[in-house]
Amino acid sequence: MKKYTLIATAPMGIEAVVAKEVRDLGYECKVDNGKVIFEGDALAICRANLWLRTADRIKVQVASFKAKTFDELFEKTKAINWRSFIPENGKFPVIGKSVKSTLASVPDCQRIVKKAIVEKLKLQSGKANDWIEETGAEYKVEISLLKDQALITLDSSGTGLHKRGYRVDQGGAPIKETLAAALVQLTNWTPDRPFVDPFCGSGTIAIEAALIGQNIAPGFNRDFVSEDWEWIGKDLWNKARLEVEEKANYDQPLTIFASDIDHRMVQIAKENAEEAGLGDLIQFKQMQVKDFTTNLEFGVIVGNPPYGERLGEKKAVEQMYKEMGQAFEPLDTWSVYMLTSNENFEEAYGRKATKKRKLFNGFIKTDYYQYWSKVRPQRKKTENA
């Protein structure tokens, strides 16, 4: 089967998490800023779209070349065997971006690439004077220029991979599903341990934890634009979806709690969990974080609390951080992970983090504060085990 260069785009700071996911699928990869690059066949395109929890999109590299003039961009784009990617009736919108490049006008670059593809497809079909009917499946082309290096790709995902298909409602400013999955994967949580999100909002972090806990592919409940691509075909997509079903561990018991101070958000979170088919796995409750108590041990708490960025909110938010620190202080077997842009978090919480990791929540620069618990003792095997 033909091999392709595939690009999993990733938010800044999450590339290493995406790379681990790619390797877990069985593909060697290399990490670059904002992307993870790997080689794979058409089945790999299906698998990556279905399984990668933290990537934004899966792109197929068509070509990469130097381009300092519009003529150069046109001729090198036209030289590509476009018929091997786009069928006769394929719809191919062209988007673009240019960074630190001679060809700085993105609209002009898009127009030239579009024209070059049209001319090549006409030439390859023997219909040089005919109009190209773009009535079929979509093959979105991107021309990306960085320091005069042109990269042409096809977007195989369609809607961004953060769109899982379970969000019925979202309330205020929800965390992206891809970032929520990364927050879970950056912890020491395993499915046999309790998991808590005390700022659940619309339930995203808890839902992503449940998907991870039962090894349910994040793309199981949605469609992808490349499902209609002729050169991949329905059979490969069916094979990849069958793998998804076979690898899911629906019998894995989970202990997941999610709470929020706002009863309306708790209701939205419940509805989203039901839509994901996980309603029975997550226990939701309206509660302030300061009231959290538990007799369970060796659990993991992950939260995306309010940041206090709005005028007049900072003092109240930092008081809440203080109360949270007091509530969590007795939980010496629990690990705590909090994402916030508030630089006073550690002082308000009352303890220095074991580790901090810089992440972006959308365009907001944040730190992921990690408080590691004491080491969980290994379970002793009995002679008859």
UniProtKB/Swiss-Prot annotation:
A GO molecular-function descriptor: RNA binding
Gene3D superfamilies in the record: 3.30.2130.30, Vaccinia Virus protein VP39
EC number(s) reported in the record: 2.1.1.-
Family annotation (SMART domains): THUMP (SM00981)
Domain THUMP as annotated: residue spans: 44-156
EC top class named in words: transferase
Family: Belongs to the methyltransferase superfamily.
PANTHER family tied to this protein: RIBOSOMAL RNA LARGE SUBUNIT METHYLTRANSFERASE K/L (PTHR47313), RIBOSOMAL RNA LARGE SUBUNIT METHYLTRANSFERASE K_L (PTHR47313:SF1)
Name of the protein described by the UniProt record: Putative RNA methyltransferase YpsC
